[in-house]
C-alpha cells in the first residue's frame, strides 16, 4: 500500500460527467429523428389549415451542438396561395 494514495485521491467526478454527456448525446441522437418527423408533420398540419402549400417544397434541418439544438423549417408558400379562414 502506498501512503501517497491516501492523500492523492482520484477525482471521479470529471469521468462521471463525461460518461453522462456521452449517454445524453446518444439518447438525443437516437430520439432526434423521430422528434423531427413528428414536429414536421404537426407544423405542416397547422400551416395547411390556413394556407394551401406543396409538401414537397418544405425543408427541415436540425443543428445540434453541445448546448442547444436548433430546428429550422423552410416552407415555400406560393404568392397565389388561397388563405383559408381558421
From Swiss-Prot:
Coiled coil: none annotated. It holds the Pfam family MinE. GO terms for biological process: cell division; regulation of division septum assembly. InterPro entries: MinE, MinE_sf. Prevents the cell division inhibition by proteins MinC and MinD at internal division sites while permitting inhibition at polar sites. This ensures cell division at the proper site by restricting the formation of a division septum at the midpoint of the long axis of the cell. Belongs to the MinE family. This is Cell division topological specificity factor. It comes from Rhizobium johnstonii (strain DSM 114642 / LMG 32736 / 3841).
Amino acid at each position: 500500500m502506498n501512503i501517497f494514495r491516501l492523500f492523492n485521491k482520484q477525482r471521479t467526478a470529471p469521468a462521471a460527467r463525461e460518461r453522462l454527456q456521452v449517454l445524453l448525446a446518444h439518447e438525443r441522437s437516437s430520439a432526434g429523428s423521430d422528434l423531427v418527423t413528428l414536429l414536421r408533420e404537426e407544423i405542416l398540419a397547422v400551416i395547411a389549415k390556413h394556407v394551401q402549400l406543396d409538401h414537397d417544397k418544405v425543408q427541415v434541418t436540425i443543428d445540434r451542438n453541445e448546448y442547444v439544438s436548433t430546428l429550422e423549417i423552410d416552407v415555400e408558400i406560393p404568392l397565389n396561395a388561397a388563405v383559408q379562414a381558421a
